[in-house]
């Protein structure tokens, strides 16, 4: 079994960027066994070029959970 994790962030690079969406799929080689997807409030504005790239807007994440609010779920699904 393995996990496939996809994240979208507020920008390129690793310094100062925040997650805006996370998707996790648990795969056994034949089929997806578990799936988790959530928008994430990055607590900073999403630049227009990232919105154009991902389709994720500031309005979409305004009331989404902050990462620390879903961290336990992320940990549990990837154990």
List the predicted regions and their residue ranges.
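Conserved non-catalytic scaffold segment of RNase H-like nuclease domains
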Residues: 1-79
